[in-house]
Amino acid sequence: MLLVFAPAVFAAGTHRVGMVERLNVTPEEFSSMVANSEHVVMMANNPVRPEFFFYRSMSQMIMALNAGEIDEILMPEDVSEYFLNANIDYTVNCVVMTPKDPFLLSFGFNSDHKELCESFDKAIVEMKRDGTLITLQGKYILGVNTAVMEERVITDPDLQQITPVTFRKFDGAPEIKVAVTGDMPPIDYIAPDGSAQGFNAAILAEIAGRLGLNVKLLNIESGARASMLSSGRADVVFWFEHKRAGGTKHDVPDGVILSEPYYQFDTFYHLKPTK
């Protein structure tokens, strides 16, 4: 097992790596950022320099991988574990840890909705304090991945093991429109019947229950997140933010404000087909 502390010394050549689209940064810029960031690579051989390609959805990315248009896909550890436990046709090529440059899960709002954002912040802080956040992580992330592993279901990553989430209804209460991509099971998932399931939905249901809000869910592609907010078609969007050391952030366009983060990833898998 090789540990490489970056800026890493890469072997000659490049590897085409797919990932779900980031906002406010190009694939070329992201490739440069990764090459010059501080991270740890664990693999059997010297890594080649990754060249990143963005896709508007997870399904498009996997199709590109299966078609040979890219060599690998990059996914967070929890998503990768779920995907691997459900699919024998893929394997881990390398593991990348970015302790100083974590990716954060939060909620995105139009900057005009500062009050709504602050109410979410308060609820998230309370959930961290009273243990609810840890409980939901155990049920919807660790618990789901364990169930998938034990069943050893070999199928598409859209699996029935993800626990459905129920949203309470409040008569006469305001309704918020929340956009979800469904691109990161068991974190973010849209079932075939259109219902939101997984960890993000569970977090949202808990917050909405505490705030007395009704929720209408909208299924979108990752690249449409900012436009959904700016157009007013959505009040809230599940957000995946890369916070770099020193406070520099990308994937946060002008006019978008983010809530207190409620989860973070600092370990990622590069997955490739077994054949």
Protein language model regions, located:
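Boundary at the C-terminal end of the N-terminal hydrophobic targeting segment
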Residues: 9-13, 150-151
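Extracytoplasmic small-molecule ligand-binding "clamshell" domains
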Residues: 13-76, 116, 120, 163-245
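Ligand-binding clefts/hinges and TM-proximal coupling segments of bilobed small-molecule sensing domains
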Residues: 39-42, 46-47, 124-166
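Sec-exported extracytoplasmic/periplasmic mature domains
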Residues: 66-70, 85, 125-132, 138-145, ...
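Periplasmic-binding protein-like
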Residues: 85-121, 144-155, 182-183, 252-255, ...
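Extracytoplasmic/periplasmic mature domains of Sec-exported, cell-envelope-associated bacterial proteins
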Residues: 230, 250-252
